[in-house]
């Protein structure tokens, strides 16, 4: 059987050794111990006085078509995947289905110009992601990756075709809507 004073001393001893180990690992600004820590702290203070960001920021990099298309490809893929996930779960759980949702939107009788904007916002990322995915598959096959001019031409082609095809889909949709009402 352990007596109470021993248990208290053991707990206090353990607690003080733990607090001692945590206390020595934390370096505050006033007690930098090594020359490297002093240099690092002075460097951060100097950067702060010049209103510079601590880490590299996107404003440091020059905008280039290659990384912008790559970023938009990733973003459009994530947004579409999230939309399918949330929409699929939502329509599985909610008491109405997708067709009822579409009929509800159609019951608002919005003008074609308003629906065209929303249709373009939906169509462009889908078309862009598809065409840019085909472009990236070509890069995976090492087609055109050693020619920077070819990379830029294919990027402009994907961007232009995506915009044109999305406009064609939206225009065709508005034409079909006006033909049905006439």
Swiss-Prot record:
Q: Which residues lie on this side of the membrane: Mitochondrial matrix?
A: 140-147
Q: Which GO cellular component term is one of those annotated?
A: mitochondrion
Its main subcellular localisation, reduced to a broad class, is: mitochondrion
Q: What does this protein's record comment on cofactor binding?
A: The heme is bound between the two transmembrane subunits.
Q: What does this protein do?
A: Membrane-anchoring subunit of succinate dehydrogenase (SDH) that is involved in complex II of the mitochondrial electron transport chain and is responsible for transferring electrons from succinate to ubiquinone (coenzyme Q). Mediates resistance to enteropathogenic E.coli infection.
Question: What does the sequence similarity comment in the record state about its family?
Answer: Belongs to the cytochrome b560 family.
Assembly and partners are described as: Component of complex II composed of four subunits: a flavoprotein (FP), iron-sulfur protein (IP), and a cytochrome b560 composed of two integral membrane proteins.
**Any idea what this protein is called?**
Succinate dehydrogenase cytochrome b560 subunit, mitochondrial
Q: What is the lineage of its organism?
A: Eukaryota, Metazoa, Ecdysozoa, Nematoda, Chromadorea
